[in-house]
From Swiss-Prot:
The keyword tRNA processing applies. The keyword Membrane does not apply. Keywords: Transferase, tRNA processing. This is tRNA U34 carboxymethyltransferase. CDD domains: AdoMet_MTases (cd02440). GO terms for biological process: tRNA wobble uridine modification. Pfam families: Methyltransf_9. Homotetramer. GO terms for molecular function: methyltransferase activity; transferase activity, transferring alkyl or aryl (other than methyl) groups. Catalyzes carboxymethyl transfer from carboxy-S-adenosyl-L-methionine (Cx-SAM) to 5-hydroxyuridine (ho5U) to form 5-carboxymethoxyuridine (cmo5U) at position 34 in tRNAs.
Length: 321
């Protein structure tokens, strides 16, 4: 099982120390309710070899390598273990010559977001809904002091720990398997990311308030979410599914989203990027057995989802507390 005690020790002397009032008990409770496959997944992490990378690049990729390459047999054993943690959704990773080609080219999103951010050097960062942690490693690559990701999905935790093991057990990033609604208001993070989460929330304004409660005064929110075309009064509430997803509740226009952020007290709210999701950014690979974007769009008109809604378009909004 994954040991969270090193993280407790890490934060004990930082401005995250108040979290120790609640977090250890929450994770003890979490351990009693884990997914039936969690024990198997965590053992796969244990089965991965302890390799030392001579070269790690988190600035332009998430990559580890060594001077003397692995043998083909060693590579195949690692691939075998990693493929038992499928589906791999967010990546890509390049680990000792193994290309983990995930469903999402999350480097595309990072390249859209990064130029607009306040410098991450020396910052304490929270990544809400972090998935398996790809963007967390890129934040470390930008010089972040500490990156904490939260995501309740046990598979993502085990994928993250597998990647960490192949990055020389780097402890500058940590994934905690909780949702933001379970976090006490810490007001301790310099930057808070919420990317690809808001539209899954039944109460989006509550989510925005929860993000605000984790920021230091003046800290930066990075919000990336689905949007639709329209004015300040435009919000899509899908009747049933959106792009085959059942858990999509509110998709606002950019203007409506800015209004929501201002309503909960954020300042300096601005949209810095809007991009339609392409078939190059989200697609099927050998590391994903499920359907992908091509299956979610109208086969005759890729400007629409299979349900007839506007195809996925994503905005990046920055704001300050």
């Amino acid at each position: 099982m994954i040991d969270f005690r090193p993280f407790y020790q890490q934060i004990a002397t930082t401005n995250l120390s108040d979290w120790l009032e609640t977090l250890p008990l929450q994770l003890k409770e979490w351990e009693t309710q884990t997914h039936g496959d969690y024990a198997k997944w965590s053992k796969i992490v244990d089965f991965l070899p302890d390799l030392h990378a001579d070269e790690i690049d988190l600035k332009s990729a998430v990559k580890s390598d060594r001077t003397f390459p692995l043998s083909e047999g060693e590579k195949q054993r690692i691939i075998h273990h990693l493929k038992q943690l499928m589906p791999w959704r967010k990546g890509p990773y390049h680990l000792f010559g193994i290309h983990v080609d995930c469903e999402w080219r999350s480097d595309f999103k990072w390249d859209r977001v990064l130029p607009h951010l306040a410098p991450l050097q020396g910052r304490t960062i929270l990544d809400v809904g972090c998935g398996s942690g790809y963007h967390m490693w890129r934040m470390v690559g930008e010089g972040a002091k500490m990156v904490v990701g939260i995501d309740p999905t046990e598979l993502f935790l085990c994928q993250f720990e597998a990647v960490r093991k192949l990055l020389n057990n780097d402890r500058r990033a940590n994934l905690i398997p909780l949702g933001i609604e379970q976090m006490q208001p810490l007001a301790a993070f310099d930057t808070v990311f919420s990317m690809g989460v808001l539209y899954h929330r039944k109460s989006p304004l509550d989510h925005l308030s929860q993000l605000k409660n984790q920021l230091v005064k003046g800290g930066e929110l990075v919000l990336e979410t689905l949007v639709v075309d329209g004015d300040v009064n435009t919000v899509l509430i899908p009747a049933d599914r959106y792009a085959k997803m059942k858990n999509v509740y509110f998709i606002p226009s950019v203007a409506a989203l800015i209004n929501w952020l201002e309503k909960v007290g954020f300042t300096n709210v601005r949209c810095v990027d809007v991009a339609t999701t392409t078939l190059e950014e989200q697609r099927k690979t050998d590391w994903l057995e499920n359907e992908s974007l091509i299956d979610f769009l109208d086969s005759n008109d890729h400007s629409k989802t299979i349900e007839g809604y506007q195809a996925p378009k994503r905005a990046v909004i920055l704001a300050n507390k």
